[in-house]
Each structure stands twice: as structure tokens, then as C-alpha cells.
């Protein structure tokens, strides 16, 4: 299996996909901020940082914010237009408020986004480390956004570069070519005005297609990744159709595009579909982390990793996330990969 995906990209999965969300502030915001609202009481504990964390592309992601009152804000390009969603949890009740043409769509998707379609009870730990990690994180459920491009484009940017480089490119391109997020934005909670609150909705497929070559260069995106994104947005409708497929078939649809391989397609369906079995192959560090955690083998490759995860068939992505969240990772043996910036050339 490993040979199929070599050479492995110099990029690693976000460590567990956990974002720290401040504790819920006691202040009563029952009046809202003028958006459409929805309340939902799931019969399980919701951990916004664990569930929504994989959707954040770096601490300065213009499409994702957390605020001191314990809320998570997201700006998305939905099938019906741009939308902003604020999500918080109070006494076990999820409170959603949304703005923009995509507001109703985002509120309708809210339960799925917070893991309603996930089935963590189907997961049976086979290793003590995994069992302990699961016990310590009862709020871990897999998000299902129902959106493909918002995960596909940043995943392409993350191919074969450091996360810092990819996050910078995403941040620069979304801020320059996206649109301000609808609604008051996170600043309104702190009494600061300004539409969108500094958040942006990612560009539409048409706008991505019109970005000049020198702007990709300035953002540090090489021609190979830029060309892949251009190919993807040319068939944007076909890409989004994959939401209606089961995860394996969706990956096949995405991989029809030249430049989108198993690593990228897995990173997408983990988010768009909540795919519990879509383990990331071709990652620089994940095989060594899984190998070290489960067998003490820090030099494991994809084939070894998949063999170790075989007892978790059907739930391999969840197992990998729990391993990442356990914190049991091998000590670094070499300096971090230096950040490159082709924009300076």
C-alpha cells in the first residue's frame, strides 16, 4: 500500500484537530445579535473545540473564530450563498445564530455539523491508550459539513508544504478574494462594530478561477497546487455532488481531478462526510505517530500503519484522531522542515 502513495508529502495532519474554546460566559445573550436562530438539545455532551476544530486552518483562519464567551464562528459559502454561523453551548443546549443568504442552510445543517450522523458507540477500543483517550474526550464526534470545496481547496494548499505555509496562503487568498462575512461578526460580542468582524467567506469557484498567476506566487503557492485548484473549480458542481455519495465513492469522484490523490480526498471526506474510516495515507508524520503509539515503531510507513489500524476497520480515522489526541508522539529527531516562500523569489 505504501508504495502506491510514495513519495509522501511533507505535511502532517493537524494534531487531533482540537481547538481550545473558552468556557461559556455567564452573560445572557437571549436577545441575540439580529440573526436567525435555532436551539438544539442533543442527548450527548458537545465539545465545540473537538468537533469543529478540524475545520480551522490555522489560528488566523479568516473563516473561523472562537470568542471569549465560548462561541465558535464560521463563515461558509453554502449552496445558496454566503453565510455566517455562531455556535455556542449553554447547559447542554446548542444555540445557533446565522446571517446572510446561507443562514437557513447553516442552521438546518447544524446538527450534522456537530456530529448527529456520527456513531461513536460503534467504536470499540483495542488498545489501552486509545481507550483512555476516548474516555477523556466524551465530546468527540465527527463533523459533517455537507460542503466539499471549503475543505478541498485548503487541503490542496497543504500538499507537500508546511502547515504554516499553507495556512498563510489560505489566509492571504481568502482575505483578498473572499467577501466579508455576513452579519455583525465576533467583534459585536465585545462591543466592536464592523460588518463581518474581520471574517471572510472564501471566494466562489469563478473568483478562484480568475486569480492571476502572480497572486498565487505572492501567496507562496507553486504552479502545481494552483493548477490543481483551477482544475477543481472548473468542475465545482461535480465536486460538490460528491456530498451525496458514500465516503469511498466520494473520494473516487474527487481523485478524478489530476493533482487530487488519496491523501487529499481523505482529508476532505473526513470533514464533508464525517467519514469515520477515511484514514489519511501518504502523510509525513501520521504513520510514525500511529506506529509509535501502538507498537513503539516510530519508523512505521503507511503499510505498517494500516496493519496496526486493521482492528479498527470502519473506524480507522476515529482511531487515528484519538491516537493524536492522546499526546503519545515520538520525540523529534531532526529540526523542523524550513518554511519556504516562493513569493520572495
PLM regions and their residue ranges:
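HhH-family (HhH-GPD) DNA N-glycosylase catalytic core used in base-excision repair
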Residues: 2-345
Amino acid at each position: 500500500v505504501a508504495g502506491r502513495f510514495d513519495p509522501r508529502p511533507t505535511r502532517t495532519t493537524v494534531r487531533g484537530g482540537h481547538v481550545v474554546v473558552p468556557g461559556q460566559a455567564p452573560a445572557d445573550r437571549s436577545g441575540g445579535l439580529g440573526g436567525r436562530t435555532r436551539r438544539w438539545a442533543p442527548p450527548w455532551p458537545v465539545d465545540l473545540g473537538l468537533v469543529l476544530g478540524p475545520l480551522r486552518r490555522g489560528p488566523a483562519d479568516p473563516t473561523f473564530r472562537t470568542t471569549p464567551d465560548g462561541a465558535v464562528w464560521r463563515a461558509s459559502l453554502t449552496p445558496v450563498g454566503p453565510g455566517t454561523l455562531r455556535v455556542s453551548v449553554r447547559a447542554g443546549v446548542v444555540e445557533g445564530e446565522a446571517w446572510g443568504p446561507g443562514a437557513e442552510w447553516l442552521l438546518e445543517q447544524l446538527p450534522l455539523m456537530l456530529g448527529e450522523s456520527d456513531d461513536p458507540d460503534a467504536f470499540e477500543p483495542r488498545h489501552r491508550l486509545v481507550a483512555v483517550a476516548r474516555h477523556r474526550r466524551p465530546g468527540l464526534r465527527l463533523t459533517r459539513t455537507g460542503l466539499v470545496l471549503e475543505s478541498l481547496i485548503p487541503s490542496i494548499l497543504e500538499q507537500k508544504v508546511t502547515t504554516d505555509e499553507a495556512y498563510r496562503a489560505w489566509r492571504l487568498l481568502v482575505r483578498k478574494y473572499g467577501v466579508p462575512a455576513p452579519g455583525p461578526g465576533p467583534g459585536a460580542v465585545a462591543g466592536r462594530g464592523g460588518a463581518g468582524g474581520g471574517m471572510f467567506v472564501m471566494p466562489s469557484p469563478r473568483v478562484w478561477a480568475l486569480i492571476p498567476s502572480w497572486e498565487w506566487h505572492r501567496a507562496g503557492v507553486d504552479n502545481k497546487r494552483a493548477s490543481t485548484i483551477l482544475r477543481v473549480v472548473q468542475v465545482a458542481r461535480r465536486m460538490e455532488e460528491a456530498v451525496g455519495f458514500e465516503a469511498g465513492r466520494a473520494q473516487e469522484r474527487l481523485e478524478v481531478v489530476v493533482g487530487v490523490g488519496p491523501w487529499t480526498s481523505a482529508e476532505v471526506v473526513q470533514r464533508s462526510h464525517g467519514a469515520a474510516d477515511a484514514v489519511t495515507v501518504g502523510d509525513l508524520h501520521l504513520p510514525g505517530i500511529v506506529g509509535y503509539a501502538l507498537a513503539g515503531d516510530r519508523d512505521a510507513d503507511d503499510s505498517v500503519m494500516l496493519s496496526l489500524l486493521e482492528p479498527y476497520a470502519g473506524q480507522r480515522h476515529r482511531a487515528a484522531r484519538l491516537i493524536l489526541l492522546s499526546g503519545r508522539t515520538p520525540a523529534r529527531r531532526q529540526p523542523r522542515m524550513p518554511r519556504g516562500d516562493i513569493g520572495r523569489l
